[in-house]
Amino acid sequence: MKRLLNSATQLLLVLVLGISLSGCVTTHVPTATTSPWQAMDLDTQANPLDVAFTDSSHGYLVGSNRMIRETNDGGAHWNERSLDLPDEENFRLISIDFSGDEGWIAGQPGLLMHSDDGGQNWTRLFLDTKLPGEPYLITALGSHSAELATNVGAVYETHNDGSSWEAKVTDAAGAVRDLRRSKDGSYVSVSGLGNFYATWEPGDSVWQVHQRVSSQRLQSIGFQPDGNLWMVARGAQIRLNDEPGDFDSWSKAIIPITNGYGYMDLAWDDDGAIWAGGGNGTLLVSRDGGDSWENDPVGDRQPSNFTRMVFDGEHAFVLGERGNLLRWVDNAV
């Protein structure tokens, strides 16, 4: 009898443990019946990192392993392109932007390229060896002008096609793991270890440092459409500024799911819905400001982490890994 009781107890413990572990991977959010996304396989092991367009139809996708693709139909099809770069260097093309036909590419190590013909030809610009950090984010500002930010928070501006650059910050922010720019030229960054974030506004000489709001390290941070901030922290926590203009005032943590995977990016579509992308095909949407969430059925089927989302007013993409890409087509499912 004692042996029988021990066996029954062990079986009960196994069942309880199994239920507990399965609970760790339950999303607790419903799956939407439709999706605006179309899954695309670029047939490459490279990771897409950024996308930009010269007009509604023509654009470029860049990424790791020197990847550059061109589209002439709004992103429905992507054709391989190449850049005139040394074969022995494996560049990561991190950022691309256009103002009309004038384009810029920033990459690592030490790569900056410029085009004045819609990307048909690219010229490499050799940067000063004393440049703090590596190119991280490039923004086209108009004719002959661009703004370059590095991975230590140095910000420079050119008005002569990159022949010379003027520093806009007297003291860099230090190593960053994420850095974003708003439409008005403000920046926000997350420190390399995720233990604080910093903001910079045009006219400031230095970055303003802000301590994280909880013990969870920060993953990424960016701007909402109204100019306030959003924050994603470890533990799948989302927070939004709850006082307009106060970058130290944050909402309580929003935790839509507890599936063991964190979020890597947050973005708003043109209808005001919030999209959260992250590990293992995590792609969630909230249409009520974060109160309730749905799981996207197309994203859920992708064997990829979603690292970035791009909404530019005319196009929308979710960038994954190893050639995985989602394109907004509206009601794909």
From Swiss-Prot:
A factor required for optimal assembly of photosystem II (PSII), acting in the early stages of PSII assembly. Also plays a role in replacement of photodamaged D1 (psbA). Assists YidC in synthesis of chlorophyll-binding proteins. A 7-bladed beta-propeller torus, about 55 by 55 Angstroms, with a depth of about 25 Angstroms and a central pore. The keyword Thylakoid applies. SUPFAM superfamilies: Oligoxyloglucan reducing end-specific cellobiohydrolase. GO terms for biological process: photosynthesis. It is a lipid-anchor. NCBIfam families: PRK13684.1. Residues 1-23 form the signal peptide. A lipid is attached at C24 (N-palmitoyl cysteine). This is Photosystem II assembly lipoprotein Ycf48. Keywords: Lipoprotein, Membrane, Palmitate, Photosynthesis, Photosystem II, Signal, Thylakoid. Part of early PSII assembly complexes which includes D1 (psbA) and PsbI; not found in mature PSII. Binds to the lumenal side of PSII complexes. Interacts with YidC. GO terms for cellular component: photosystem II; plasma membrane-derived thylakoid membrane; thylakoid lumen. Belongs to the Ycf48 family.
